[in-house]
């Protein structure tokens, strides 16, 4: 155990309607005392949020590696992969049984995020098929701007010493 494990880390409490205010405050106080940044959201908001920022990205990493390796030249492609693929696919090495359970338990929200992703991917595909370099650049720039602004925000995961 490491005493600083939860310091400066986000902890989200997801109280149920039957959760008493005193119990919720006690849980908040414990996490706060060990240095965690504590917030509260409904279980439904939690499931939607983490389907978007955790569950879908894991599924995409699994799918990207599987898609690569399903091709006859997949192993050769992998031999040539660099830091971009390494960074993108890092989470594909996650425990399969843990992620099977997470994705299954949050199926509805994950499928909603898959639909959103499919729309975004279709936009890229359409721009490529149409040879629309301006649309392609716009889609890339839009994502780049959001990602850059997010990394500058105080308190987000990218501003921590390590991104675990």
Predicted regions and their residues:
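Charged/polar positions within long, soluble alpha-helices
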Residues: 61, 65, 93, 122, ...
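Interdomain hinge/lid region at the active-site interface
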Residues: 74-143
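Rossmann-fold dinucleotide-binding core
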Residues: 1-38, 47-50
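Substrate/ligand-engaging "lid" and interaction regions
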Residues: 38, 49-87
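SAM-dependent methyltransferases
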Residues: 133-164
């Amino acid at each position: 155990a490491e005493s600083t494990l939860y310091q400066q880390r986000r902890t989200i409490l997801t109280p149920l309607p039957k959760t008493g205010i005193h119990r919720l405050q006690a849980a908040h106080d414990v996490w706060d005392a060990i240095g965690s940044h504590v917030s509260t959201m409904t279980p439904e908001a939690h499931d939607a949020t983490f389907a978007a920022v955790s569950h879908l990205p894991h599924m995409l990493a699994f799918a990207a590696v599987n898609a690569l390796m399903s091709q006859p030249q997949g192993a050769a492609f992998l031999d040539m992969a660099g830091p971009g693929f390494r960074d993108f696919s890092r989470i594909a090495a996650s425990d399969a049984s843990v992620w099977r359970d997470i994705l299954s338990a949050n199926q509805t929200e994950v499928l909603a995020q898959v639909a959103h992703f499919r729309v975004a991917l279709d936009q890229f595909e359409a721009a490529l098929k149409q040879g629309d370099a301006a649309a392609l650049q716009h889609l890339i720039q839009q994502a780049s701007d959001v990602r850059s602004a997010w990394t500058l925000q105080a308190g987000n995961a990218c501003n921590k010493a390590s991104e675990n």
